[in-house]
């Protein structure tokens, strides 16, 4: 038995034990396709039948069984040794017509387009330019400005900020709002995130080495307040939520999304209310490569959802297979796993994360999505990456 196989076998035992102890669901794996179209899949009700559908690459798949597919844009298959033109996918009604549309986050630095739902008609969906350059490898989707609509958190033209759309002007490009001075925010910038760090009700933005505080009255063109802190060397998505239940939002992130390490940063405040963080290790950034402890390289996508129904959000992540091809990064051909890390709050032991494996032959891309697809109130898992498109339905 090879060392990787031995590690994988040990991991399977741990995963089974984790499911039993944490109340995490078992999953049915649906292999939608083994072709590489994208590295980020998402969800939405595209035909208004009340059932959640899935979009991955050039197709959307009808729920609840996801067997019937519809081509909404031209099909192009990619080789897994390279990259696709679709790094992440997000959905919303971009033109206010009541139908769910699709936005494709492109290869970093390229122009981003959204595709207008054709309302059940045959043929490709109309294509609209959203943003001339979508920079960064982990753009996020969340309401930054408080208007009730999701914004695209990304870099653009050397700035970090967010792009907004106006459904009343669906044919117009999106507006990018910088929150930083112009700097080294390149097309390959690692680490984007959002959330209310200081508890003032305003959404702040995060990067690998800092968080940016949104002013009470943000003015266009004025940078937000920067607070330096080393969350990661090269993060993917930075998740912001209250991990330990103390009322303060913490940060969960990969340490190096092309290497190893998963950590959470506990928010702490001094007697004057100044904010700092204390790092806690979930998976070590420098694991023993000869040991049997769980290690996952290329944690290039993270999501948060309550998978076991205990009211505490858990972390969903996994390996991005061949992030830099078959010879790049650490252990590029190790099992492409998907994991939940179940959060347990214990007054005596503090916070612990129990790993529960969803699958060992799919992995994540630059995105992984969690959504209740089958109506059982348990988050299901959606993946589009170099191995194909996969849906994991709780059962």
Feature locations, PLM:
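Beta-propeller-forming repeat regions
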Residues: 18-395
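N-terminal secretory signal peptides that target proteins for export/translocation
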Residues: 1-2
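Bacterial N-terminal signal peptides
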Residues: 5-17
